[in-house]
């Protein structure tokens, strides 16, 4: 347990996470100061009166006078004000670091470019199925500090690369990097290796590292060591086994579950199930209850979610695909009897869209591209692409064209913030229009 008595603490960034940090310090007899670059950040109305606040910009004077800065994952450590504070020897941490210093129960930690929310939720469900008192959160659901509880027997945290950059005390009982594909390149000027380096911090002091046999970038810098357990499509300690037209989850050569018993579908979800099982095994959860959880889990909204099946057409909301790798995961091994009508677009965060090209061949694909980077996406295969300003226009354009056997898939490969509040709002809008048009 760290002691913050008498420390001058400054919190950057409000919202739910910022408020959880404020409450954390107030409970320990320390009154922090809060700043946010937004004029009226979310949660401002919930900030206790006693807490000094500065909004609309950063307050360099407060920062340079601080003993400890708690930075929101939304602000880059490379920001000149934070750089100056770091150069002056001021400690900069995030909420996850505060959490790790206090947590008394083992932590399962999950990061990766795609699939992390599904895997985090699944491991949480496996723990619940075993009757374990579990706290699930971090980058999804509740901020980590709100999970702190003496009664808790296990924590399962989803961590972003931004959160890992400010964390040094994590000692996970099991940690994984699911995959590393381009994302947030606007925050990583030195490219993919800089982004990977942030993710690799999750393995420091971890007891078991669950690595992706199909993605070398998920391996520890010095290569696999005795802490590593692997998963993969065809290889790895945990892998998929295809026999007589059926697919099984297999662990070290032993078939443990036929995927037809799972509610989740799609190859990317079968590998998510493998990782969750590997993490649950490493955390000491009983295998039987973990497998039972796999047969009941229905998946998360906006993640390859079938929102309508009508007249032989499936409308699928994969709005959570906010980067190229996530859309690749949706398209990889996808089977459509008729034509795939694929909706792409939004803010691409300076990503390279070219990896998508290999999935867009053949006569049975139509692209509908919208939003800020619509033109760039339409250029992937111009002869089958149409460009509109908004997603709604795209859906009204494609609706009269769909035939039985077709699939309409929103898997945009982009963030939603150019036209929507968040990916959830984009997904809800898609679902609403699907029900109207389908």
Swiss-Prot record:
Its main location: cytoplasm. Keywords: ATP-binding, Cell cycle, Cell division, Cell shape, Cell wall biogenesis/degradation, Cytoplasm, Ligase, Nucleotide-binding, Peptidoglycan synthesis. InterPro entries: Mur-like_cat_sf, Mur_ligase_C, Mur_ligase_C_dom_sf, Mur_ligase_cen, MurD. Disulfide bonds: none annotated. GO terms for biological process: cell division; cell wall organization; peptidoglycan biosynthetic process; regulation of cell shape. GO terms for molecular function: ATP binding; UDP-N-acetylmuramoylalanine-D-glutamate ligase activity. Belongs to the MurCDEF family. This is UDP-N-acetylmuramoylalanine--D-glutamate ligase. Signal peptide: none annotated. It is an enzyme of class 6 (ligase). Cell wall formation. Catalyzes the addition of glutamate to the nucleotide precursor UDP-N-acetylmuramoyl-L-alanine (UMA). It catalyses: UDP-N-acetyl-alpha-D-muramoyl-L-alanine + D-glutamate + ATP = UDP-N-acetyl-alpha-D-muramoyl-L-alanyl-D-glutamate + ADP + phosphate + H(+). It comes from Shigella flexneri. It is found in: Cytoplasm. The keyword ATP-binding applies. ATP binds at residues 112-118. One of its GO terms (cellular component) is cytoplasm. Its EC number is 6.3.2.9. It comes from the Bacteria.
């Amino acid at each position: 347990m760290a002691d913050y008595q008498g420390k001058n603490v400054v919190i950057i960034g409000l919202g739910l996470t910022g408020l959880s940090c404020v409450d954390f310090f107030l409970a320990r007899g320390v009154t922090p100061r809060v700043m946010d670059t937004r004029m009226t950040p979310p949660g401002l109305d919930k900030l206790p009166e006693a807490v000094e606040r500065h909004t609309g910009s950063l307050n360099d004077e407060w920062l340079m006078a601080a003993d400890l800065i708690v930075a929101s994952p939304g602000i880059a450590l490379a920001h000149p004000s934070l750089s100056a504070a770091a150069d002056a020897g001021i400690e900069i941490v995030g909420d996850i670091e505060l959490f790790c210093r206090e947590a008394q129960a083992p932590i399962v930690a999950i990061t990766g470019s795609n699939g992390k929310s599904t895997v985090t939720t699944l491991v949480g469900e496996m723990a619940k199925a075993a009757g374990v008192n579990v706290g699930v959160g971090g980058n999804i659901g509740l901020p980590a500090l709100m999970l702190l509880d003496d009664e808790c027997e296990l924590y399962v945290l989803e961590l972003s690369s931004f959160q890992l950059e400010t964390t040094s005390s994590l000692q996970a009982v099991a940690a994984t990097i699911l995959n590393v594909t381009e994302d947030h390149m606007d925050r990583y000027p030195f490219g993919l290796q800089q982004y990977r380096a942030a993710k690799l911090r999750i393995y420091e002091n971890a007891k078991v590292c669950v690595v992706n046999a199909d993605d070398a970038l998920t391996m520890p810098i010095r290569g696999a060591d005795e802490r590593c357990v692997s998963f993969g499509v065809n290889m790895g300690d945990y892998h998929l086994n295809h026999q007589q037209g059926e697919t099984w989850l297999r662990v070290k050569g032993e078939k443990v579950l036929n995927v037809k018993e799972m509610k989740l579908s799609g190859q990317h979800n079968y590998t998510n199930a493998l990782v969750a099982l590997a993490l649950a095994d490493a955390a000491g959860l009983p295998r039987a209850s973990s497998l039972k959880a796999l047969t009941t889990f229905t998946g998360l909204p906006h993640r390859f979610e079938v929102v309508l099946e009508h007249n032989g057409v499936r409308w699928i909301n994969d709005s959570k695909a906010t980067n190229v790798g996530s859309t690749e995961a949706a398209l990889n091994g996808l089977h459509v009897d008729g034509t795939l009508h694929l909706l792409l677009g939004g803010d691409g965060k300076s990503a390279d869209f070219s990896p998508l090209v290999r999935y867009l061949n053949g006569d049975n694909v139509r692209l509908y591209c919208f939003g800020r980077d619509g033109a760039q996406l339409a250029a992937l295969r111009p002869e089958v692409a149409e460009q509109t300003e908004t997603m709604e226009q795209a859906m009204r354009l494609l609706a009269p064209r769909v035939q039985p056997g077709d699939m309409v898939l929103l898997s945009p490969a982009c963030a939603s913030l150019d036209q929507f509040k968040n990916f959830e709002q984009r997904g809800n809008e898609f679902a609403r229009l699907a029900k109207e048009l389908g």
